[in-house]
A protein has these predicted regions:
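A structural signal for multi-pass alpha-helical bundles of membrane permease subunits
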Residues: 1-194
Length: 194
């Protein structure tokens, strides 16, 4: 039992546990929330729908290490990154994301990677919804918001459960994104249990 006692009394363990829970919870909220909204949006016909869907699912096919390197050096770098250039263009000081907001940076990267998965599952569920239900609701005077909350969202319940379950399994073992971008730092700011 000495090992368990050491684990429970180790402050690094508790910081890592909290970081893991924050990472998993935040990514789930972002991917399920945005995935649901994008699924409803992509269910509507619009010009270039096929290309838009292809671009929306593309991040899922990028390796985690490559994704982390792209975000670290191309997007979030304070001097050479797109976000730094955008900040300077708007007259603000560029933000060193990985030094000032390490956990938020990792959450954004991992959310960007897992949003396509949630979108695919939820879009499939939205497309399986019978149009007669929506039409009947429309004839009864239900607006778009009422249709979303009383027809679409309840229909997505099982799909949302699947997304949460599968993403949780994989998010508990996120390692590459953290190691490549922050190495768990500064200090223990982005260290997780993996």
């Amino acid at each position: 039992f000495d090992n368990y006692e050491f684990l429970v009394t180790d402050p690094d363990f508790w910081a890592s546990l909290v970081n893991t829970l924050v990472l998993v919870g935040s990514v789930l909220v972002i991917t399920v929330g945005l995935g649901t909204l994008l699924a409803v949006l992509y269910d509507q016909p619009f010009p270039g729908q096929g290309v838009a869907r292809l671009l929306a699912i593309a991040p899922f096919f990028v390796m985690p290490t490559v994704s982390a390197l792209v975000w670290k050096n191309l997007m979030m770098h304070p001097i050479y990154g797109v976000l730094g250039a955008l900040s300077r263009g708007l007259g603000f000081e560029p933000v060193d994301w990985f030094a000032e907001y390490p956990m938020l940076s990792v959450i954004l990267i991992v959310s960007w990677q897992w949003l396509p998965f949630a979108l695919l599952i939820l879009l499939t569920a939205v497309q399986s919804l019978d149009n007669e239900q929506k039409e009947a609701a429309r004839m009864d005077g239900a607006g778009a918001v009422a249709q979303f909350f009383f027809i679409t969202l309840p229909h997505l319940g099982r799909a949302i459960s699947v997304v949460i379950m599968i993403e949780t399994i994989f998010l508990l073992s996120v390692f590459a994104e953290i190691y490549v971008t922050t190495s768990g730092g500064p200090g223990l700011a982005s260290t997780n249990l993996a």
